[in-house]
Amino acid sequence: MGIVVIGDVFIDIKGYSLSPYIPQGRNAGTVIQIHGGVARNVAENIANIELQPTFISAVDDNAMGEDVIQKLKRHKVETKYIKKVPNGMGTWLAVFDNEGDVVASISKRPDHKPIEQILDEYGDEIFKDA
């Protein structure tokens, strides 16, 4: 029986202040960018325990979207039901203070229509062995 994970891919952009955060000021620190999204994280973690899930989602139709797909493939996630489209991924921008607490964030949600289209077109095929 196969495991199917359905959901969003996000790109998380996280900024970490090196000293006490000043909301109206400039803050020196570090900024990282990582692949995120709860469903993407779940699919990757399931694959890390060698269960080879199928992931149904969408990614942006650019190099970042392709990078997400390639990383999932390296983890042995089945990616044939990931659609490349404009606005396929969400973005989460978070700012952390020097103690690691979130002090600000903005989230851009992706378009969910591509996932609906995948399920409409391939749902029977996807779930027959799930």
Where are these regions (language model features)?
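Glycine-rich phosphate/adenosyl-contacting loop at the front of the ribokinase-like
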Residues: M1-I56, A63-D67
